[in-house]
Amino acid sequence: MARITTEDCSKVIPDRFQLVIYATRYAKLLNYKVETNQSKKEKRDKPPVIALRRIASGKVSVAQLEQDFINSLRTRSRIEPIVEQDESEDLEEKFEYLPEVYIGEDYSDLDDQIFTEETGEDFEDK
């Protein structure tokens, strides 16, 4: 059994990097898709070998492989649209778990403490 090499495929796809990308993509497609028209020789080979053989023989359209690869890179269908919400609804939802506490303006418990504005420390401690 002769091994398939990249030199065999270089006549169809001259760039080796593109060859690897297209052959990988086609091999994944072969792996997921069950084909009934495979020959006995292809049935015992692995999908990457089958992909390289078909590319070298010209059985696979390089333009179709390129288009499939480009479509796989598009993210438009994967991005979810942004739905704008009212900000006041968001604030109400965030604080629903807090208990209701009355806060008055009585600061009588702070009368005996003097704070500095710059450091926030007590004068009495110094």
Curated annotation (Swiss-Prot):
First-tier enzyme category under EC: transferase
The enzyme's E.C. designation: 2.7.7.6
Cellular component terms per the entry's GO annotation: DNA-directed RNA polymerase complex
GO-annotated molecular function: DNA binding; DNA-directed RNA polymerase activity
Catalytic activity: RNA(n) + a ribonucleoside 5'-triphosphate = RNA(n+1) + diphosphate
Higher taxonomy: Bacteria, Pseudomonadati, Pseudomonadota, Alphaproteobacteria, Rickettsiales
Protein name: DNA-directed RNA polymerase subunit omega
Listed GO biological process terms: DNA-templated transcription
PANTHER family: DNA-DIRECTED RNA POLYMERASE SUBUNIT OMEGA
NCBIfam families recorded: rpoZ
Quaternary structure and interacting proteins, as annotated: The RNAP catalytic core consists of 2 alpha, 1 beta, 1 beta' and 1 omega subunit. When a sigma factor is associated with the core the holoenzyme is formed, which can initiate transcription.
Alphabetized UniProt keyword annotations: DNA-directed RNA polymerase, Nucleotidyltransferase, Transcription, Transferase
Similarity field: Belongs to the RNA polymerase subunit omega family.
Function of the molecule: Promotes RNA polymerase assembly. Latches the N- and C-terminal regions of the beta' subunit thereby facilitating its interaction with the beta and alpha subunits.
SMART domains: RNA_pol_Rpb6
Pfam families noted in UniProt: RNA_pol_Rpb6
